[in-house]
Amino acid sequence: MTKTGSKGGNLRDKLDGNELDLSLSDLNEVPVKELAALPKATVLDLSCNKLSTLPSDFCGLTHLVKLDLSKNKLQQLPADFGRLVNLQHLDLLNNRLVTLPVSFAQLKNLKWLDLKDNPLDPVLAKVAGDCLDEKQCKQCANKVLQHMKAVQADQERERQRRLEVEREAEKKREAKQQAKEAKERELRKREKAEEKERRRKEYDAQKASKREQEKKPKKETNQAPKSKSGSRPRKPPPRKHNRSWAVLKGLLLLLLLCVAGGLVVCRVTGLQQQPLCTSVNAIYDNAVQGLRHHEILQWVLQTDSQQ
């Protein structure tokens, strides 16, 4: 049969005690659901069919004690095949198996195994032996179980080693990340400190500039009166004004000399009888007489004479 359901309805009719014979049934697939409904069928014969694979849920038929899968086209067994922990007898004669799943090591109750006529891996083929009789098949079961346990242990060690490598790599990544984050924090901290210092300097510079600006008007106000009061004495008179005073002084001096000369001539020489000299002498006498009666002049003359 090419479909699992074509004969699924009469599986119970094939059940003989605890044995269910589905050999030579032209099966391409295993009727797992129907088999799961027959937990009494602890002995299952699926030999001489066209099975190339077993579904993963086949491993849920944990009630199986004896299983015949010989003369099919099986290329591999499910990864969870070791779940069939009650299996004691397993016939895999004449299939296309190269290796067995690691979980095979869990079949602790397996007592009989036939792996003849399979393209097994050379190491596994050497362990399995020839399986030519009952004794060799029992030895095959024992040796293959021991071999698969060793393979399982090796794989577990390899898995643990990979996990350790991954953990170490993760630790290194975490340490690297932490170092990177610490470096970034330190960089941010330094940048923040530099920014704070820059702002402080700007603030101090602004305060200093403000103080200078406040001092500058005071200096100007303090210096302004000094410049006004002190500049006048130092300021030289215009040259033109100096020249005028010099000329005026010269003229006055010349006039005084002329007056004095004329006065001397009129009083000493023989010209004193002349009308002009008579007038000059009269003016001089009146002036001297008036000055003598002046109170201030008298006080000055007395003071001078006392000294």
Swiss-Prot record:
Residues 229-242 have a biased composition (Basic residues). One of its GO terms (cellular component) is nuclear envelope. Residues 150-242 are annotated as: Disordered. The modification N6-acetyllysine is found at residue 135. Keywords: Acetylation, Coiled coil, Endoplasmic reticulum, Leucine-rich repeat, Membrane, Microsome, Nucleus, Phosphoprotein, Repeat, Signal-anchor, Transmembrane, Transmembrane helix. It is found in: Microsome membrane; Endoplasmic reticulum membrane; Nucleus envelope. Residues 148-216 form a coiled coil. One of its GO terms (biological process) is intracellular signal transduction. LRR repeats lie at residues 10-31, 40-62, 63-84, 86-107, 109-128. Required for nuclear import of FGF1, but not that of FGF2. Might regulate nuclear import of exogenous FGF1 by facilitating interaction with the nuclear import machinery and by transporting cytosolic FGF1 to, and possibly through, the nuclear pores. This is Leucine-rich repeat-containing protein 59. It comes from Rattus norvegicus (Rat).
